[in-house]
């Protein structure tokens, strides 16, 4: 029996039509939903990977659209996942840098301003002796590895303070130890002081004054300065509010340099203006923690001024709603008014980012110790436990973790962007605890051994570098951000004598050397954002979007750490080369700018003076030319924004408070 169609025609034609529609629907479904199985997150099984490779040969653009920026189009043969990842990274960088990368170059770079070298500040001796005198093995051209010993527990001012509960105001009034403004000085008598060294130190101090004074003139209370246009700048990480990022980030550097007047101006602004109350800012949990909480904590350790403890706690409290996830892994962004938190849309299916949620431990642990409130430490311990217990592919930590499911996102690993400071905080949490947090040291060693095995490589030209790893494929590229790891490996070597000590030190020196090479292979003598290793090039950027330099500190951080640990003069020489390059290319009449292309003889400037230039770049350079007794590495551990935090049990400035027990336990 024939069914009659609505228009009264026989349905044999209708069946053919149905077939055709069915076919079209199946094809559409395949095109729409087939991609789900081919997304990078689902690369867990070989079968899917094989299918993906098969289709990739046929034309990857079917599933993964080509990058939109034609001008930045990578080489056609490149793995499309690398393209996707780079796009996401670019988005993150854009979010950090605001519109700076897109801006038309401003007219006129400005000439270096006249600078006035201040008379040397009176230098009080540092409170505790420097890194123990270590014998230098000069014959072999390098120092024997010194070991920064664990402090003797209980034998320190911090433990004495903790046994005498006081209010913060009482503590401050009763003259708790205060680091001398000027941060301590050179141990040598002035007449035996190396004149050149002192000149270099003073030069860096003058750079800080130049950066600060222009920020004050044109952007006071705003987040950052645009030196060319002489107006404020704010990256989206600061939530579009005037949070005085440069003040909070740069203040401990002023203190260390003994710039008292400037320091007092900054303190005054924080007291009168800094607050996150009654604003609805969407802040980056990570950036707010490392710059604002970290900066305030250091200032509290230096001075004992309760203002800084209160502000640190105030900021940390605003971040706490971000931790309310099924796993306790925090979201990346939080609204300071509503407490609504979320992740970046681009981060592997709603994942949190390893380098962000893994870089809270130092600040939150210290905040608990100085406030007596265990809550902050509990929050970061939860993150630690998740990361300890989760299965690590080949012993490595992927960059993305879903805070709802507790499962890894894309299997991309990096010691540069998206991964970097997680590894840093494992070692430093152990150091900060006075080498008692053994769990952290074990996790650090396990992670670094896997990285040594799977990601550290040597180029044909003999340069040691850390590759990114993406689904078992090495991308022979290193971010400038990963240049901090030279210092990290060296610090790992210097603090524990074991089977890996020599390897860590060798790799630490090798990476630092490679980062230096990336600088001196550019005509500006400043290093690019990322550099590659191929048959054609070594330690050079290849793509236009990785040729910029935004006043980053990581290479100088490694010079500083390696100098302290080896006393090899070359690290100071390299630091001075960098100072000259910064002065030649980045200095303007109204502050310091990054460069758009380090390979040009006369590169355009980017018109942003990053807050980390004052917090990190200038601080590390200043310390490089300072005596070891200024912030000795066996008493201070630097957070990832170069804010030094005291080491428990070794440092009189730890200022531990008595633990405040919950009411139910108090009786
Ligand atoms: C800083 O904000 C911190 O060092 C962070 O860990 C990553 N890099 C920037 C400066 O380059």
UniProtKB/Swiss-Prot annotation:
A Gene Ontology molecular function term of the record: calcium ion binding
Lumenal-side positions = 40-667
Catalytic residues of the enzyme: 529
The record's annotation in Pfam families points to: Glyco_hydro_47
> What's the catalysed reaction?
N(4)-(alpha-D-Man-(1->2)-alpha-D-Man-(1->2)-alpha-D-Man-(1->3)-[alpha-D-Man-(1->2)-alpha-D-Man-(1->3)-[alpha-D-Man-(1->2)-alpha-D-Man-(1->6)]-alpha-D-Man-(1->6)]-beta-D-Man-(1->4)-beta-D-GlcNAc-(1->4)-beta-D-GlcNAc)-L-asparaginyl-[protein] (N-glucan mannose isomer 9A1,2,3B1,2,3) + 4 H2O = N(4)-(alpha-D-Man-(1->3)-[alpha-D-Man-(1->3)-[alpha-D-Man-(1->6)]-alpha-D-Man-(1->6)]-beta-D-Man-(1->4)-beta-D-GlcNAc-(1->4)-beta-D-GlcNAc)-L-asparaginyl-[protein] (N-glucan mannose isomer 5A1,2) + 4 beta-D-mannose; N(4)-(alpha-D-Man-(1->2)-alpha-D-Man-(1->2)-alpha-D-Man-(1->3)-[alpha-D-Man-(1->3)-[alpha-D-Man-(1->2)-alpha-D-Man-(1->6)]-alpha-D-Man-(1->6)]-beta-D-Man-(1->4)-beta-D-GlcNAc-(1->4)-beta-D-GlcNAc)-L-asparaginyl-[protein] (N-glucan mannose isomer 8A1,2,3B1,3) + 3 H2O = N(4)-(alpha-D-Man-(1->3)-[alpha-D-Man-(1->3)-[alpha-D-Man-(1->6)]-alpha-D-Man-(1->6)]-beta-D-Man-(1->4)-beta-D-GlcNAc-(1->4)-beta-D-GlcNAc)-L-asparaginyl-[protein] (N-glucan mannose isomer 5A1,2) + 3 beta-D-mannose
Secretion signal: which residues? none
Question: What are the annotated disulfide bridges?
Answer: 483-515
Query: Has the keyword Ligase been applied to this entry?
Result: no
Q: What job does the chain carry out? A: Involved in the maturation of Asn-linked oligosaccharides. Progressively trim alpha-1,2-linked mannose residues from Man(9)GlcNAc(2) to produce Man(5)GlcNAc(2).
Protein name as catalogued: Mannosyl-oligosaccharide alpha-1,2-mannosidase IA
Q: Which organism is it from?
A: Drosophila melanogaster (Fruit fly)
């Amino acid at each position: 029996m024939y069914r009659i169609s609505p228009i009264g025609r026989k349905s044999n034609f209708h069946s053919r039509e149905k077939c055709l529609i069915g076919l079209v629907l199946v094809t559409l479904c395949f095109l729409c939903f087939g991609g789900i199985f081919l997304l990078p997150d689902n690369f867990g099984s070989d079968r899917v990977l094989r299918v993906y490779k098969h289709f990739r040969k046929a034309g990857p653009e079917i599933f993964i659209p080509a990058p939109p920026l034609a001008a930045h189009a990578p080489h056609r043969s490149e793995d499309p996942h690398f393209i996707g990842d780079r796009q996401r990274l670019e988005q993150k960088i854009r979010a950090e840098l605001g519109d700076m990368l897109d801006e038309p170059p401003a007219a006129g770079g400005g000439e270096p301003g006249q600078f006035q070298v201040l008379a040397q500040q009176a230098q009080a001796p540092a409170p505790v002796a420097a890194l123990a005198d270590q014998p230098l093995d000069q014959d072999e051209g390098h120092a024997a590895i010194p070991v920064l010993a664990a402090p003797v527990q209980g034998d320190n001012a911090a433990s004495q303070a903790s046994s005498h509960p006081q209010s913060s105001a009482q503590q401050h009034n009763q003259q708790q130890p205060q680091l001398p403004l000027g941060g301590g000085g050179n141990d040598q008598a002035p007449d035996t002081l190396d004149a050149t060294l002192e000149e270099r130190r003073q030069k860096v101090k003058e750079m800080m004054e130049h950066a600060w004074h222009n920020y004050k003139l044109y952007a006071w209370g705003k987040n950052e300065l645009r030196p060319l246009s002489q107006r404020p700048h704010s990256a989206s990480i600061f939530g579009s509010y005037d949070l005085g990022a440069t003040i909070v980030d740069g203040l401990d550097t002023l203190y260390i340099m003994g710039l008292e007047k400037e320091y007092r101006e900054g303190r005054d602004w924080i007291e009168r203006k800094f607050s996150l109350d009654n604003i609805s800012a969407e802040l980056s949990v990570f950036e707010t923690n490392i710059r604002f909480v970290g900066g305030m904590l250091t200032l509290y350790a230096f001075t004992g001024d309760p203002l800084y403890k209160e502000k640190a706690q105030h900021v940390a409290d605003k971040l706490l709603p971000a931790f309310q996830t099924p796993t306790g892994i925090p979201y990346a962004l939080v609204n300071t008014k509503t407490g609504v938190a979320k992740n970046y849309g681009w981060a592997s299916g709603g994942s949190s980012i390893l380098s962000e949620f893994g870089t809270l431990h130092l600040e939150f642990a210290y905040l608990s110790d100085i406030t007596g409130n265990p809550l902050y430490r509990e929050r970061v311990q939860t993150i630690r436990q998740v990361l300890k217990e989760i299965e690590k592919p080949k012993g490595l930590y992927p960059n993305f973790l879903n805070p709802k499911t507790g499962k890894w996102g894309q299997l991309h690993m990096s010691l540069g962007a998206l991964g970097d400071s997680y590894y840093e905080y494992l070692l430093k949490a152990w150091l900060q605890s006075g080498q008692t947090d053994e769990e952290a040291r074990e996790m650090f060693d396990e992670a670094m051994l896997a990285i040594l095995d799977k990601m550290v490589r040597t180029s044909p030209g003999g340069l040691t570098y850390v590759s990114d790893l993406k689904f078992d494929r090495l991308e022979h590229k290193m971010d400038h951000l990963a240049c901090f790891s030279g210092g990290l490996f060296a610090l790992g070597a210097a603090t524990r004598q074991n089977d890996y000590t020599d390897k860590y030190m060798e790799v630490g020196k090798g990476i630092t050397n490679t980062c230096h090479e990336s600088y001196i292979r550019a005509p500006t003598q400043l290093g690019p954002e990322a550099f590659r290793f191929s048959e054609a090039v070594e330690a050079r950027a290849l793509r236009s979007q990785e040729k910029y330099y935004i006043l980053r500190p990581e290479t100088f951080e490694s010079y500083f750490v390696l100098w302290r640990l080896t006393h090899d003069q070359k690290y100071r020489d390299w630091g001075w080369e960098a100072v000259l390059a910064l002065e030649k290319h980045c200095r303007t009449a109204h502050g310091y700018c990054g460069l758009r292309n380090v390979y040009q003889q006369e590169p355009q400037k980017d018109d942003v003076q990053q807050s980390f230039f004052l917090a990190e770049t200038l601080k590390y350079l200043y310390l490089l030319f300072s005596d070891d007794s200024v912030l000795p590495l066996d008493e201070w551990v630097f957070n990832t924004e170069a804010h030094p935090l005291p080491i428990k049990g070794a440092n009189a400035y730890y200022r531990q408070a008595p633990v405040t027990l919950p009411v139910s336990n108090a009786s």
